[in-house]
């Protein structure tokens, strides 16, 4: 099995869907390793725009089988709603090519209610979650009281565990705007149609052990990783290389490439430190030109300059073999473009390669920038590297050098499926 892993290198929304879509055309199997319907990928394919949340993007390729892995949390209503939306847009037979590991956990409507209550209790210290129930679901998993997807098929077991969860949350929060009987009733219907999608992950993957091309699609990004991200302003799963290996039982020696996806600038949704954020006309312009609104929440994304410190840190943890730089065209009309190259910590320490673990310290760092000239010309839809303006090529090559020579093999130059330069 030759495995390619695609990972977000910043705070998510880097545009992982397009490279995943492109690579899935040659893949036999596409797997999601972690996260849930809090993730969001947009793929423009012909005249259709597809929004993916819990489903793997490999569904667009008619020859690619797709697995939602053991490290994920699955909101069953969203799973079926998303499948129906894809089939309505012409992806006929998609439902026959997607499977769920029986060890994945069930994200309930109950978890979404609890998510809102937990955020409300934090007041001004909100994490800024998507409100989808991801955190409470992973909390139940860690506390060993969660419900696994395979347990949905055992009606008595499922109902007993769900009632126990509801009872525990009522003891904690008091009255809940939630009716456990309604959720139980909905799952009576899901149970009838979910069975064919549920698989023993290890046995399933064994069938593909000789596959020359397996694609692993990362969700969220390294800076949202539970261990390595800007804790506590993170998601509740392991979003990096280690999480993918663990969740899908990958043999590390089978990994042929690790692709880090980086936006040509930096964005973040929700709360938390963001050293290179631009709360000025530059940030507003990036937001407007880049149409920076979250696929999952619709929230306005915070915008800032490219941060080499953050990306060096990400590279050190995820060990990228190549990069996909996205949305280069958004920078077309800037006279000058800044790149963050170092942080000055509150105590005066200068760092180029790592970030402080303390979110409050990270929030107070000063960023040291270099300024590069813009190219002030259109790169939208450019297909060849040599056709890019000289200053655009200089920008890309500066990033490559700043990340120790990791090659930028793919460059996104627009929203369409084929708006991609391949430097193979």
Swiss-Prot record:
Enzyme Commission number: 6.3.4.4
Subcellular location: Cytoplasm
Cofactor note: Binds 1 Mg(2+) ion per subunit.
Cofactor: Mg(2+)
Binding site for IMP: 13-16, 38-41, 130, 144, 220, 235, 299
Active-site positions on this chain: 13, 41
Pathway in which the depicted protein is active: Purine metabolism; AMP biosynthesis via de novo pathway; AMP from IMP: step 1/2
Stored InterPro entries: Adenylosuccin_syn_GTP-bd, Adenylosuccin_syn_Lys_AS, Adenylosuccinate_synth_dom1, Adenylosuccinate_synth_dom2, Adenylosuccinate_synth_dom3, Adenylosuccinate_synthetase, P-loop_NTPase
Subunit annotation: Homodimer.
Name of the featured protein: Adenylosuccinate synthetase
Organism of provenance: Aspergillus terreus (strain NIH 2624 / FGSC A1156)
Lineage, opening ranks: Eukaryota, Fungi, Dikarya, Ascomycota, Pezizomycotina
């Amino acid at each position: 099995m030759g495995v390619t892993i695609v990972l977000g290198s910043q705070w998510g929304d880097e545009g992982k869907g397009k490279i995943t879509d492109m690579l899935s055309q040659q893949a036999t199997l596409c797997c999601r390793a972690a996260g849930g319907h809090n993730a969001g990928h947009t793929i423009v394919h012909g005249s259709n725009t597809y929004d993916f949340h819990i489903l793997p993007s490999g569904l667009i390729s008619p020859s690619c089988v797709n697995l939602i892995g053991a490290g994920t949390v699955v909101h069953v209503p969203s799973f079926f709603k998303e499948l129906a939306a894809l089939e309505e847009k012409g992806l006929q037979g998609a439902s026959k090519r997607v499977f769920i590991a029986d060890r994945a956990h069930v994200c309930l409507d109950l978890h979404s209610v609890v998510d809102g209550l937990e955020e409300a209790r934090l007041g001004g210290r909100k994490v800024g979650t998507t409100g989808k129930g991801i955190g409470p679901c992973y909390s139940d998993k860690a506390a060993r009281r969660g419900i696994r997807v395979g347990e949905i098929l055992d009606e008595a077991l499922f109902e007993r565990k769900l009632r126990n969860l509801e009872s525990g949350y009522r003891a904690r929060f008091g009255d809940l705007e939630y009716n456990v009987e309604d959720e139980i009733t909905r799952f009576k219907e899901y149970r009838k149609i979910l069975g064919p999608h549920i698989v023993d992950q290890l046995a399933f993957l064994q069938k593909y052990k000789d596959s020359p091309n397996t694609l692993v699609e990362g969700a969220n990004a390294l800076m949202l990783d539970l261990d390595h991200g800007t804790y506590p302003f993170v998601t509740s799963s392991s979003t990096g290389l280690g999480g993918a290996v663990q969740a899908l039982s990958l043999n590390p020696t089978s990994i042929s490439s690790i692709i880090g996806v980086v936006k040509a600038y930096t964005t973040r949704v929700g709360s938390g430190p963001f050293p290179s954020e631009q709360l000025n006309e530059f940030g507003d312009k990036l937001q407007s030109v880049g149409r920076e609104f979250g696929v999952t929440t619709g929230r306005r994304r915070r915008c800032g300059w490219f941060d080499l410190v953050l990306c060096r840190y990400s590279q050190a943890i995820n060990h990228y073999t190549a990069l996909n730089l996205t949305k280069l065209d958004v920078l077309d009309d800037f006279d000058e473009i800044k790149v963050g190259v170092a942080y000055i910590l509150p105590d005066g320490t200068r760092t180029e390669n790592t970030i402080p673990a303390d979110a409050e310290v990270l929030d107070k760092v000063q960023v040291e920038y270099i300024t590069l000239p813009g190219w002030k010309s259109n790169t939208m839809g450019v297909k060849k590297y040599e056709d890019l303006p000289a200053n655009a090529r200089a920008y890309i090559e500066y990033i490559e050098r700043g990340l120790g020579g990791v090659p930028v093999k793919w460059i996104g130059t627009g929203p369409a499926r084929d708006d991609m330069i391949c430097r193979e």
